[in-house]
Regions:
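Charged, amphipathic alpha-helical coiled-coil/dimerization segments
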Residues: 72-130
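Residues within helix-turn-helix
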Residues: 53-54, 65, 72, 92
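The N-cap/first-turn positions of alpha helices
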Residues: 18, 36-38, 100
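Short, locally clustered residues in the helix-turn-helix/winged-helix DNA-binding domain
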Residues: 15, 43-47, 108
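Pre-recognition alpha-helix immediately N-terminal to the DNA-recognition helix
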Residues: 13, 40-43, 102
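N-terminal leader segment of winged-helix/HTH proteins
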Residues: 1-32
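Alpha-helical linker/hinge and terminal dimerization helices associated
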Residues: 17, 21-24, 60, 103-121, ...
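N-terminal helix-turn-helix DNA-binding core of bacterial DNA-binding proteins
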Residues: 23-63
């Protein structure tokens, strides 16, 4: 086996699939005025309602300097609020706003719309997701 062949790499099909799936999200997310990264942040916010910045960084597998501009745009759109915890300038609490909660209704169609674009059996999708989640756990 030649380990330097592209077809032998695990990372390449993961990279291509990730890129292509995010591309397919784009027209659906444009309808609700979100980028993919903003969308996944909002999914966390819809679930948590309130979360510390450092916990969001860990949950999203992103660096704080990558996440900060995304949060700024969500704040500018009035979807979230950032509050500093008294006595600790580095500890920030993120809260979803009423407008952010209302956006969830519009966003409910996005997963179904995307599902129609992907030619994968439901069972295969579940299996793939389970495998990827196990792989993600090794990164912590």
């Amino acid at each position: 086996m030649d380990y330097l062949k592209l077809d032998e790499q695990l990372c390449f099909p993961l990279y291509v699939c990730s890129k292509e799936i995010i591309k397919r999200y784009k027209p659906f997310l444009e309808q609700i005025d979100l980028t993919y990264t903003q969308y996944i942040v909002m999914m966390v916010m819809w679930e948590e309602k309130e979360i510390q910045f450092r916990d969001l960084v860990n949950k999203m597998y992103l660096e704080s300097n990558t996440l900060s501009p995304v949060l700024k745009k969500l704040e500018d759109k009035k979807l979230i609020e950032r509050k500093k915890i008294t006595g600790n300038d580095k500890n920030i609490i993120l809260s979803i706003t009423k407008k952010g909660i209302e956006l969830k209704e519009e966003a409910k169609l996005v997963p179904m719309q995307l599902g129609k674009c992907l030619e994968i059996k439901e069972e295969d999708g579940k299996t793939l997701k389970e495998i990827l989640h196990r792989l993600m756990q090794t990164f912590n």
